[in-house]
Amino acid sequence: MKIEVEAKDGPWFKRMGLPQRGVIMAARRFIDLSITIEPSLPSDPPMMIPKIDYLDHAMGAVQMQDFFPGLKQDQLPGGLGWALEFLSLTTHSGTHLDSPYHYHPTMDMGKPAMTVDEIPIEWCFSDAVLLDFRHKGDGERITREDVICKLDEIKYEIKPLDIVLIQTGADRAWGTPEYLVKGAGMDRESTLYLLEKGVKVVGIDAWSWDRPLPFLAKEFEKTGDPKVIWEAHFAGIEIGYCHMEKMANLSAIGRPHGFTVCCFPIKIKRASAGWTRPVAIIDL
């Protein structure tokens, strides 16, 4: 991206640190890390599959007549009006950012858990690191040791407020029923390792930050141990954090670090999550 500015003399340019005369050059690549919200895809449990009712331009013309008494449809350009969509979905549909309130009413060992409208926006724009665990099988744990080894491999040290992205390859199954059981997942200890480093936002290209629910259910049935249930989510009871789920296209980033992620969530009052369109930004 090339930005050209014809600078004029004045205090605004001095405050902004811009040259009094000249050209500002910027080259960046923007990578969309979200999936598209679509109706009727079987990649969610039935109760969570989005529904979209589309109001086309012809129907919009009819609706506009209610807002403009006396308006005739042929008075509109081409006899057409506005288009609208009516959606029925959850805050966890599509790519979204979960708030600490999703996991439990409290966080940080007893403080009220933040809802998505309370998330500090500075958490959602930061340096990022991509950890590739595509070699792990569906339902496998990504352990604390796995995370440490991967960071050593890519020669990166986590900083406070870094955004950590976990790549499992599950996004390749998006749009199919198999998506619900695809990918490895984080556990309590690996999640806490990141949080203890000062990380506040993480993300994964799978349906859940934890291992897929059917794998958790099978392990619980076998062992009877409730600690296997939602263990990575429940880590947020100890240290509050947010995670993005249903991310996509992480392979397009093309590097393990040296990029920024922007992932501001939609601000919904008292909500456990908000839709987001995360973007990786790479300076070229």
Please identify what each model-predicted range represents.
Residues K2-L284:
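Active-/binding-site microenvironments in catalytic and ligand-binding cores
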